[in-house]
Structures are given as C-alpha cells and as structure tokens.
C-alpha cells in the first residue's frame, strides 16, 4: 500500500479510521465457467450481463438469464492484464478469473472501494503469465474511514456515477443508431440531399 498522507487532519490518521484488508471489508470470489444460457445480445430471456477478464467493453462477454451477483460491487481483472477495476451496479455474472468484491456495507461502500482500488498499483504473481489470486488479494490493505464519512462520501459521489451511467446508455443508443443509418446513407437508400444543413 502506498504511503498515506493526512494533511487535512494535522498529518495524523483520525482515531475512528482504521487500516483493514480487502478480505475483512468485502466478500471476494473469482469468476468461474460461463453459464449454459448465453446470448451475444441482450434479449427478453437473457438480460443480465456476463463479464470476463477482457478490457474491451469493460469485459462484456454476453448476456444470460440469471445473475450470480446482485449487489453493487467491484470487479478486478486477475489474469493477463492485472488490475483493471470496474464498478458494477446492475446484477451480473463474472466468469474466467474475474475477481469480484462485494463490500460489507457496514464497513464500506462499493463506490469508495472502487475509487480506492483505482488508485492502487495492483500486481499479480507468476513469471510466465501474471495472475491475481483471491487469497493473495484479500491481504491487500485499505484505509477505512468512519461510517459517517463513508456515507457522506458515497452520497456526494453517487450523482456523478449516475451521470456517467446515463451517458454510457445514451452513447450505446447513439452508436446503435449510427450503425443502422450509416449503411443506408452509403447505399443511397436514405436520401439526405434535400436537407438544409
């Protein structure tokens, strides 16, 4: 854990803040095999995202019919590119060595945990292929403020995350619209010559 500086607190850690471990403040698990029901696109049956160790599309692998994780949580890539951290706010299924941390909410929030992990330099073990293991990662230290401060912090950052998620949904809709319209424009099926631009 990198050195902590407490300038706003006269360079001292507040008495009611503690240094704990990820194993103490979260329920940690590693993703397993992909589910039996998998769809490449979201359907009425398969509405829950499946996330893998990949970096593209935040690890989105596909969709399935039953979530494994329902709580707001954090995932960390555990093989290959180690330490890619994502905040997950909708129910999902983690697969293929993706580590999931479900925070114990009496200690910490998922948003605080996510932002704490984002600023860490997370390293794995192994010479041929780097990997992060649950037992090893559970020992990682984390600063835990008082419950009052965690609640206040989470309340302050929640609207920012809501805005990010809303923008992501809007971007996906616009990308889908572009992909539908562009071939029609290029083929001449859709005529825009009369538009006054």
Task: Pin down the residues of each PLM region.
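Non-catalytic DNA-recognition/assembly elements of restriction-modification systems
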Residues: 1-35, 44-56, 143-152, 158-192
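DNA target-recognition domains and sequence-specific DNA-contacting regions of bacterial/archaeal
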Residues: 18-145, 196
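Short histidine-centered catalytic/ligand-binding loop motif
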Residues: 98-102, 153, 163
């Amino acid at each position: 854990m990198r050195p902590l500086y407490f300038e706003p607190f006269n360079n001292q850690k507040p008495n009611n803040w503690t240094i704990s471990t990820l194993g103490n403040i979260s329920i940690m698990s590693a993703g397993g095999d992909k589910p039996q029901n998998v769809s490449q696109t979201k359907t009425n049956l398969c509405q829950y995202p499946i996330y893998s160790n990949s970096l593209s599309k935040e690890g989105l692998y596909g969709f399935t019919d039953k979530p494994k994780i329902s709580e707001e949580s954090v995932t960390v890539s555990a093989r290959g590119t180690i330490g890619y951290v994502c905040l997950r706010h909708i129910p999902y299924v983690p697969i293929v060595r993706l580590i999931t941390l479900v925070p114990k909410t009496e200690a910490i929030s998922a948003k605080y945990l996510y932002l704490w992990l984002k600023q860490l330099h997370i390293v794995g073990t192994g010479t041929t292929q780097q990997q992060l293991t649950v037992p090893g990662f559970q020992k990682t230290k984390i600063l835990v403020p008082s419950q009052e401060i965690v609640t206040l912090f989470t309340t302050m950052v929640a609207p920012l995350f809501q805005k990010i998620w809303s923008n992501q949904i809007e971007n996906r809709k616009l990308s889908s619209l572009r992909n539908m319209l562009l071939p029609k424009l290029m083929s001449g099926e859709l005529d825009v010559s009369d538009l006054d631009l």
